[in-house]
Amino acid sequence: MEELRIEANGNLGPIDSSRIPRYAGAATYARLPRLDQVSKADVTVVGVPFDSGVSYRPGARFGANHVREASRLLRPYNPAWDVSPFENIQVADAGDMAVNPFNINEAIETIQQNALDLTANGSKLVTLGGDHTIALPLLRAAAERAGEPIAMLHFDAHLDTWDTYFGAEYTHGTPFRRAVEEGILDTEAISHVGTRGPLYGKKDLDDDHRFGFGIVTSADVYYQGVLETVAKIRDRIGNRPLYISVDIDVLDPAHAPGTGTPEAGGITSRELLEIIRGFRGMNLVGADVVEVAPAYDHAEITGVAGSHVAYELVTLMADNAVEGDRHGAPNGYAQQALGARIQEVAQAIGGQR
């Protein structure tokens, strides 16, 4: 099938779906080439089939392949950005990391080392989980490559800043507390987005505030809208090296039923995609999409959502790689003036301080 791939600008792209049906053949992300089929990848998509850190429903170990299967529907041109990401840069699928499902500490070390190996030549990672435990080693690797503490946006229904759970320091509910303690996050530029639902106590919020996290709740997104949400986030992050971690349960269960710890009242898939599009020009150095658990999915709803979130993250990386003056706002069909509007909202917010 390799001769039936789309090629442009020296980059080997996905299998041509006008010649080979989307449902045919083994699934790689967006039907892209495997890493061993290209000389170098600017962006590497990699799976981490690990869910030994979950506190409720298991099954996220099967998430990466579920997202890959759903990504067969993706097409090479992203009209919301006016970008063909697979033409701008070389994107490849590295398959899955081989991690120990019975030893969380060893798995974390393996993920961190594999991430460092995959980024040794300058490639950026978009990682498909797996549960949220995997974010810690990925952040460690990203901060090491950046040479400094990095900014982070954490899209999630939950805070994931517990201290321990059943005495364990490393679970899917603790990665960002550990990351702050280890000094790998820039605590002036970290925020949760989409949080909601009951907590064990107010101390959870007090601790989170003490660590430096900003919080944009799902209700904030609903009442303030995408534009103000994006403006506030951009104002907080600036141009720092940025890592984006997306727990699919940030979405309402109507949009993402296939996850281990669902919470009612989430944001929509449209809101999530539009928020990411509003980050055009930001310095994204790595990203993950985690907690997709296909056993609880219906008609690939969650897999499709996860595949599109990853696609927007890859597009953001590809768009940043293009030189010239194209770093305006995504056209977003009806949102031609998004960039200018974000600036207006940001100025208004600044005037209220």
UniProtKB/Swiss-Prot annotation:
GO molecular-function terms, A-Z = agmatinase activity; D-arginase activity; guanidinobutyrase activity; metal ion binding
**Keyword Cell inner membrane on this protein?**
no
Database matches in CDD domains: Agmatinase_PAH (cd11592)
Enzyme group, top EC level?
hydrolase
Substrates-to-products reaction catalysed: 4-guanidinobutanoate + H2O = urea + 4-aminobutanoate
- Annotated Zn(2+) 2 binding lies at D156, H158, D247, D249
Q: Which domain of life is it from?
A: Bacteria
GO terms, biological process? putrescine biosynthetic process from arginine, via agmatine
Is Cell cycle there in the keyword field?
no
Q: What is its EC number?
A: 3.5.3.7
| Binding-site list for Zn(2+) 1 | H132, D156, D160, D247
Q: How is its activity regulated?
A: Strongly inhibited by the metal chelating reagent 1,10-phenanthroline. The inactivated enzyme is reactivated markedly by incubation with either Zn(2+) or Co(2+), and slightly by incubation with Mn(2+). Competitively inhibited by 5-aminovalerate and n-valerate. Also strongly inhibited by thiol compounds such as mercaptoacetate, 3-mercaptopropionate and 2-mercaptoethanol.
How activity varies with pH is as follows: Optimum pH is 9.0 for 4-guanidinobutyrate and 9.5 for D-arginine.
Cross-referenced InterPro entries: Agmatinase-rel, Ureohydrolase, Ureohydrolase_dom_sf, Ureohydrolase_Mn_BS
* Keywords tagged on the record: Hydrolase, Metal-binding, Zinc
Required cofactor names: Zn(2+)
Described by its record, this protein's role is as follows: Catalyzes the hydrolysis of 4-guanidinobutyrate (4-GB), a metabolite of L-arginine, to 4-aminobutanoate and urea. Shows lower activity toward D-arginine (5% of the relative activity) and very weak activity with some other substrates, including 3-guanidinopropionate, 5-guanidinovalerate and L-arginine. Cannot use guanidinoacetate, L-2-amino-3-guanidinopropionate and creatine.
Cite the record's note on assembly: Homohexamer.
The family annotation for this protein states:
Belongs to the arginase family.
Identification of the protein by name: Guanidinobutyrase
> Where does this protein come from, organism-wise?
Arthrobacter sp. (strain KUJ 8602)
Lineage of the source organism? Answer: Bacteria, Bacillati, Actinomycetota, Actinomycetes, Micrococcales
